[in-house]
Design a protein with these regions (language model features):
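Short, exposed coil/turn segments at beta-strand boundaries within extracellular/luminal domains
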Residues: 1-10
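Structural signature of tandem-repeat unit edges
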Residues: 14-21, 41-49, 64-94, 105-118, ...
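A short acidic, amphipathic alpha-helical/loop segment
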Residues: 52-60
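Acidic Gly/Asp/Thr-rich repetitive segments characteristic of extracellular carbohydrate-active
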Residues: 17-39
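Consensus positions within tandem repeat domains that build extended binding/scaffold surfaces
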Residues: 99-100, 120-123, 143-148, 169-171, ...
Length: 247
């Protein structure tokens, strides 16, 4: 079956092949629909998937440019990878796994699952994802390098009110967003160099009132952020010194 997606990615209409899968069997489900998985460009998945299915999408679906996982549930899994410098794929239930679309240069459009809780490290690292990113409500953590070195992300970044932690280092380093950077009030942790080298962010930088920890260089080289930075009373960890300042 086919389905049109009119609103989920920058209001760009996309026609998807819709595949209902069970975890670990996406490849077989595509074959059962009489489709060649190596030639599919726009894919919408329903049902359940796991790390092995992300391996198929990342490493074997060579034409894939748009993925819609809005109605899918992600199940825990692990797929070991030791080729071409790519990382292994792993995650728990309702987590977008580690490196699941790492260096997937052809991928330009992605719709997140409604039930997503965590975006694991390097999930989209150096992929071709473009335009805006709208992280869905329910996500509580975004990990190390998830959106690192992605200059084609030249739209807006929307973070959910449920977000508690942006952890590790370089999570949005070098992203090309052009928008105001609005941090959710419930955000408690910002890791090192999280927004390093993102000059497209503009407007007043406001740290959340519940922020407890901020890492070195978190906003370094975000030269178009301005305003009088107010340090929240909840902050217990802040780097010091000219080389470690968060901005």
């Amino acid at each position: 079956p086919w389905e049109n997606d009119l609103v989920s990615h920058d209001a760009t209409a996309k026609e998807y092949v819709v595949i209902n899968s069970t975890a670990g069997h996406l490849k077989e489900a595509i074959a059962a629909a009489n489709k060649d998985y190596t030639k599919l460009k726009h894919l919408k998945v329903t049902g359940t998937i796991n790390a092995y299915d992300f391996h198929i999408m990342r490493d074997s679906m060579f034409s894939l440019s748009a993925v819609n996982l809005k109605e899918v549930r992600i199940k825990a899994g692990y797929f070991e990878c030791n080729k071409d410098g790519l990382q292994s794929i792993m995650g728990e239930d309702d987590e977008l796994p580690t490196a699941c679309f790492e260096r997937k240069s052809l991928l330009s459009s992605f719709v997140f699952p409604d039930t997503l809780k965590v975006i694991k490290g390097s999930a989209f690292h150096e992929s071709g994802l473009s335009g805006s990113v709208n992280i869905p409500e329910g996500v509580v953590e975004i990990e190390n390098g998830a959106f690192e070195n992605m200059p084609n992300l030249n739209g807006s970044l929307t973070l959910p009110s449920t977000l508690k932690r942006i952890t590790g280092v370089n999570t949005f380093l070098g992203a090309g967003f052009v928008c105001e950077l609005k941090l959710p009030e419930g955000l408690e942790e910002i890791g090192e160099q999280i927004f390093l080298g993102c000059p497209g962010f503009h407007g007043e930088l406001k740290l959340p009132n519940h922020l407890k920890k901020i890492g070195a260089g978190a906003f370094k080289d975000c030269k178009n952020l301005n305003g009088n930075l107010v340090i929240p009373q909840s902050l217990t960890t802040i780097p010091t010194g000219p080389l470690n300042a968060p901005v």
